[in-house]
Amino acid sequence: MSVYDFTCTTMQGKEVSLSQYKGKVILIVNTASKCGFTPQFAGLEKLYKEYKDKGLEILGFPSNQFNEQDPGTNEEIQEFCKVNYGVTFQMFKKGDVRGDNPQPLFAYLTKEKGFKGFNMDHPIAPKLVPMLKEKHPEILEGDGIKWNFTKFLIDREGNVVER
């Protein structure tokens, strides 16, 4: 099994087989529009523009599971991303990325690449980890997605190589 075996729905409601990305490097990101990490959209878009002609695809998957930081509709989220960050990479419809009913793609990704710990050198991590311990200790358990903007790097053969 690989990411190419999954079909996901775009913000526009179109079903897309991830097999269309065969031979490309894919960065899959769970996103949110009202998060301390939201400015990462700018860096992701810059990365996409710089490397898309060399075979990079970035796929964004909004989720409202972490402190309800993406409460808008798919249309509102897409508009926010375009207006504020000029996002041109493919965004998919909002859905769960962890818990009892995650999107199948995210169940697969987290099974393939478990959680290795937070990067405590990141300026937000020293604030995020204590908040999670206090308010959402269940998030810290297991290999599920821990917060917004978790990234999975997929190689040109469809293998999950990094989280």
Language model features by range: what are they?
Residues K24-I26, S33-K34, T38-P62, C81-Y85:
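Conserved helix-turn-beta segment immediately C-terminal to the redox Cys motif
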Residues Q40-G43, T73, I77, N101-P102:
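Stable alpha-helical elements in mature extracytoplasmic
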Residues N30, K52-N74, V87-G99:
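Thiol-based oxidoreductase modules, predominantly thioredoxin-like and allied folds used
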Residues F80-K82, G86-R163:
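Thiol/selenol-based redox catalytic cores and closely related redox-interacting motifs
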Residues V3-Y4, I26, N148-T150:
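Short loop/turn microsegments at loop-to-beta-strand junctions
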Residues M1, Q20-K22, D53, D100, ...:
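A generic fold-level signal
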Residues M1-S19:
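N-terminal "domain-start" segment that seeds a small globular fold
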